[in-house]
Amino acid sequence: IKVDREERPDIDMVYMDACQLMTGRGGWPLNAICLPNGQPIYAGTYFPKQQWQQIIEQLAKVYREEPDKAHDYAGKIQQKLDALNRWDSETSGPLHRAQLLEQFTTLAENLDWVEGGPNRAPKFPLPGQYEYILDHHLLTGDESAKDFLHLSLIKMSNGGIYDTIRGGFCRYSTDDQWFAPHFEKMLYDNAQLISLYARAFAWSDAPLYKQIAEECIHFCEEELGLKGDQALKGGQALKGGPERSEGHNHTHAVYGSALDADSEGMEGKFYVFTREELLTILSDEEFALAEIQFNIQKDGNWEHGYNILHQPLAPLQVLEKSGLTAAEYHPRLLSIKQKIKRYQDSRIRPSFDDKAICSWNALYLKALADAALFLQNTNYSEKATALADWMWLTFWQNNELLRIHRNGITKISGFLEDYACFCEGL
């Protein structure tokens, strides 16, 4: 039985917990072998075909010859799963500053104080963790938390995990320096990162954070926005199922889930370039700057001669190496990005998951509201209002919230995350 974990996160959670109990780790794709009653007796992530066949044959033999053993093991796993979801209420007292500092000290042991983020690979952006670190700094005045937050936000936005041409963050970095991403780009990641960078701008007044938040919104609108037969106007719902928008000329009122990592049979093909391609796309002056700005290498800075466009140097270092003034640098860099984007537009695009998920759209609703507030942009509040109206009219049916909308059909009762995210977005 194949289950879409985005449609049924409740089922995914049960078998992911089982996988972590059995193996000590989790991930996707998630595969589980269960008894007829649904209790898991084996779980893991990716298996090569031959290994998967061997596992199935071995477990089938155990179930045929020693069924009691299989049922006993499944029962023990079920007991542990039940214990994971059992919460004991405790009376807690007031939270003191010393406790907050102790919690951050524990967290700090698992942080990378050179590259930002967690001290391991792969590296996920983890916006909720950075929100906590910002709150910790504001509550306690802890300067180390402030320094780490700045470090992480800058390193992430300059790394290959961030798409400097089209905006938007990829799912995670495969290395510990934010360089080589898994190129999938998802709505719920970018929504939370928009909120984070917009809030960080209001806190610090750092122009980079405003730029990143705006570029991520631009990405969501251009790449993930859906349109229907009729744009949302005057509180009326879109008619029919959403379809993908091409460009900026449509009013979006709902958003798809993700862009795939692959195109043309290669992960990242849409986003990476050979040196020869860039020499063809750009003028000599533009290429000279791009080579410094994005660390372009003759044989590629990544795999198979391709370059990931990352930005290891600070702007002042780029100015020093290029010999340009700030007045020359900014328009030239803008021209470079525009030309690369036009070239990308001629490529085969990654496939687009166009299902609209309630909780993910609600996170983007919150992101637009945060951007409207922290960046002082009324255009974002108008987009947020349109999205909220669409969600009410589409996801709220017969006094319950539904989770998935695709091809004109809204289905699957909402989960706690759908209600919680929608309430927060509103």
Predicted regions and their residues:
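Long, K/E/R/D-enriched contiguous segments that form extended
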Residues: 356-362, 366-426
